[in-house]
């Protein structure tokens, strides 16, 4: 990762929107501020924002700055190829969409036991290594959502992989499902640099319950998001921490505490541990709002938004959540009770959530009769 200047990356996944389209004017401001502060790592994938992430990146970054000014990561996602022959045309379409001739990093996206078998059957890894040999990719890596044992298997079978992107934050650190700590330890064993995704857990660690927020506020040292990102960035071998920034204020906040990065001190680590305990006591739905589930939903249910209002009601117990459920998130889309239990959402969820059962819980909470 020799071209990276600092250890904060810009994830092009949660960009500001104007209706269905990316707010390009604000995104340009965000990109300009990020680069001006000395940061240069950008991360995208074709599935982000239904393809709009790549085209926004071209409009806001690659068409406006020299290629040597930024490091660019893209990904090969299982949904977009069925055979080995599909991979190269898809890759070339990604280059065109992003407006570049090469990618600094090309990641085998969302590797899990199921996805890994598909990638192997289609010789996706071999194709990626060939693209590297041709100079179209500088580094080949993976992004990963599965057990530490599965990660160890992949890195053992493909030791030439150069980086691993992991979900890593203080709530998931010892979570038995996500296994952030154990996966991180596997990367250390294999000597692979780690790129962190979801350091703020889809925004959940920026919008803490009041009692948890009070613990961090008492430190008088920064935003809730700042402690989450600094927690992740403070581990040896973690070379990059991605933040899916949604407005200029978030960019400015991240720049302020990551420009001259300092790991959490003992007092801050103790506070984060207390927040971790409070957060876990709330029994919240651990959705990161990646929105992979919404694209194939036949009932057009805005699943992450319904989970967000469910969490909000558990935390705040006020009328706002009911209002947003009935008047905003289900006004033009499906209600939780509209779920036909087809299971498409669960097959693509990186968090392995039991979405169908959770939607039934949401319906029971918000669609009470009488």
Regions found by a protein language model. Give the residues of each.
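Conserved residues at the C-terminal ends of beta-strands
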Residues: 11, 45, 106-109, 143, ...
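Short, well-ordered alpha-helical microsegments
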Residues: 53-57, 147-152, 251
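Structured C-terminal cap/extension of enzyme domains
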Residues: 32-35, 39-40, 59, 182-370
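Structural motif corresponding to the early beta-alpha repeats
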Residues: 48, 64-85, 109-110
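Glycine/proline-rich, positively charged
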Residues: 18, 32, 81-200, 208-211, ...
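N-terminal binding-site loop/beta-alpha segment at the start of enzyme catalytic domains
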Residues: 1-70, 127, 133
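Short catalytic-loop micro-motif centered on adjacent basic/acidic residues
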Residues: 41-48, 138-142, 240-242
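Hydrophobic residues in well-ordered beta-strands that form the structural core
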Residues: 43-44, 74, 196
């Amino acid at each position: 990762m020799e071209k990276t200047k600092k250890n904060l990356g810009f994830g092009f996944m949660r960009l500001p929107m104007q209706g269905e389209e990316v707010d390009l004017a604000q995104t340009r401001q965000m990109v300009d501020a990020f680069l001006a502060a000395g940061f240069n790592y950008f991360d995208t994938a074709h599935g982000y924002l239904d393809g709009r992430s790549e085209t926004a990146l071209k409009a806001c970054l690659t068409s406006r700055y020299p290629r040597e000014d930024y490091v660019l990561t893209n990904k090969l996602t299982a949904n977009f190829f069925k055979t080995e022959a599909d991979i190269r045309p898809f890759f070339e379409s990604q280059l065109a969409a992003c407006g570049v001739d090469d990618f600094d990093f090309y990641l085998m996206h969302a590797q899990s036991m199921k996805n890994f078998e598909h990638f192997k059957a289609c010789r996706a890894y071999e194709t990626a290594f060939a693209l590297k040999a041709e100079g179209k990719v500088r580094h080949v890596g993976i992004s990963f959502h599965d057990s530490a044992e599965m990660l160890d298997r992949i890195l053992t079978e493909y030791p030439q992989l150069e980086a691993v992107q992991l979900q890593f934050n203080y709530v998931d650190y010892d979570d038995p499902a996500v296994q952030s700590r154990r996966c991180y330890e596997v990367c250390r064993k294999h000597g692979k640099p780690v790129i962190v995704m979801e350091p703020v857990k889809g925004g959940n660690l920026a919008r803490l319950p009041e009692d948890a927020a009070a613990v961090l506020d008492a430190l008088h040292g920064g935003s809730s998001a700042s402690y989450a990102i600094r927690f992740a960035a403070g581990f040896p071998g973690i070379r990059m921490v991605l933040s899916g920034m949604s407005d200029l204020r978030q960019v400015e906040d991240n720049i302020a505490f990551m420009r001259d990065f300092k790991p959490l001190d003992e007092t801050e680590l103790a506070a984060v541990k207390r927040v971790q305990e409070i957060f876990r006591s709330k029994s919240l739905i651990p959705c990161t709002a990646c929105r992979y589930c919404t694209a194939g939903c036949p009932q057009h249910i805005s699943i992450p938004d319904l989970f967000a209002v469910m969490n909000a009601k558990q935390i705040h117990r006020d009328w706002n959540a009911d209002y947003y459920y009935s008047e905003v998130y289900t006004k033009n889309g499906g209600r939780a009770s509209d779920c036909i239990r087809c299971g498409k959402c669960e097959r693509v969820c990186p968090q392995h959530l039991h979405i169908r059962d959770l939607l039934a819980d949401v319906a029971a909470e918000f669609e009470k009769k009488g």
